[in-house]
Amino acid sequence: MSEEKPQQSAEEPEPGEPKAKPAPEEPEPGEPKAKPAPEEPEPGEPKAKPAPEKTSDYYRISEKLPVRFNNPGWFHGYGTKEAVSMYRTSNQTYGSRAPTVHEMPKVFYPSSNKFSRQHAAFGMFQSHNINVTLEKSLVTGPDNHITHYDRLNFHPSYNVNRPSICD
């Protein structure tokens, strides 16, 4: 007595193997294609969060770029209560959301603080001269000086005895 295993058809998988999905039927010409149903994870499995986007995933970045600029997810917008759309300005919209990878800097140029250190040690330049110069008028030219005693001499056409025409 020999026991024979029943032959499995080519369509049935081995025990323990997942069942193969049937081939989608081709729609008739002129009919829209049906979208495949998204595969949902099994109820027991938690959904894995996607890794946060990095600027380096989309752009070539400088080697000297600080880490915070490669991770825009670290920044948060300054969200506030929604303003009435009639009164909303573009400035309010700009600061209310976190930046995307496309808005982050790709290159970083650090600046020296040599200027600030020098002024912290010695202070700003101060002129101790006495202010005795006369003001030169841009209206009358460099030859005419406006002084404290001749304030009405600001333009050659200002003369009550003659018409107001420049000589």
Curated annotation (Swiss-Prot):
Disruption phenotype annotation: Mutant mice exhibit severe laterality defects, including situs inversus totalis and heterotaxy with randomized situs and left and right isomerisms. They show partial embryonic lethality associated with heterotaxia. The motility of tracheal cilia in adult mice is also affected. At 8 dpc, they have a reduced beat frequency of nodal cilia. 50% of tracheal cilia axonemes have missing dynein arms. Double PIERCE1 and PIERCE2 mutants show high levels of embryonic and pre-weaning lethality. The few mice that survive birth display hydrocephalus and laterality abnormalities, dying by 20 days of age.
Chain intervals with Basic and acidic residues compositional bias: 16-54
Signal sequence coordinates: none
Region described as Disordered: 1-54
A single GO BP: cilium movement
Descriptive protein name: Piercer of microtubule wall 1 protein
Induction: By p53/TP53. Protein levels are stabilized following gamma-irradiation.
Assembly with partners or alone: Microtubule inner protein component of sperm flagellar doublet microtubules. Interacts with CFAP53, ODAD1 and ODAD3; the interactions link the outer dynein arms docking complex (ODA-DC) to the internal microtubule inner proteins (MIP) in cilium axoneme.
Matching Pfam families: PIRC1_2 (PF14892)
Organism: Mus musculus
Family stated for the protein in its record: Belongs to the PIERCE1 family.
Protein role: Microtubule inner protein involved in the attachment of outer dynein arms (ODAs) to dynein-decorated doublet microtubules (DMTs) in cilia axoneme. Functions at the initial step of left-right asymmetry specification of the visceral organs.
